[in-house]
């Protein structure tokens, strides 16, 4: 799709994320706003809006990708909990936000903000975070 950052990549994706790698049926993206260290997005490989738009097999593989990403986040960053968000009314591409939460830290026991615009990293810090995640995939 023409205006979809997940589909087009490049500058559209760079506004909010950095591609880490491809998984079985999705791409793993580091969310640039890192108020929750280790926050990522798992975006389905094709431009579909809903889970019901893909086959049972593809849906199962998509959730395997979500679980793979969650395991990597748990090992790399040791959150107390990972929150999962699937919204998409602003951009209809099937994706999940995986948001590590840390007890007694930012937004613990509350719903996470989509983009609090509080924490951005240097290019070197993003690269380190990406390598840390990749090491545990």
Give the residues covered by each predicted segment.
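HIT superfamily nucleotide-processing domains
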Residues: 1-137
């Amino acid at each position: 799709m023409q205006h979809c950052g997940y589909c087009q990549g490049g500058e559209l994706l760079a506004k909010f994320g950095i591609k880490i790698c491809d998984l079985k049926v999705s791409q793993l993206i580091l969310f640039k706003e890192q108020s929750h260290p280790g926050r990522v997005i798992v975006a389905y490989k094709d431009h579909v809006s809903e889970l019901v738009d893909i086959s049972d097999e593809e849906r199962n593989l998509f959730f395997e990708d979500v679980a793979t990403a969650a395991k990597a986040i748990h090992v790399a960053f040791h959150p107390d909990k990972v929150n999962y968000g699937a919204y998409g009314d602003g951009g209809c591409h099937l994706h999940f936000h995986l948001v590590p939460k840390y007890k007694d830290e930012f937004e613990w026991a509350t719903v996470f903000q989509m983009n609090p615009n509080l924490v951005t990293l240097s290019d070197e810090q993003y690269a380190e975070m990406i390598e840390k995640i990749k090491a545990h995939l």
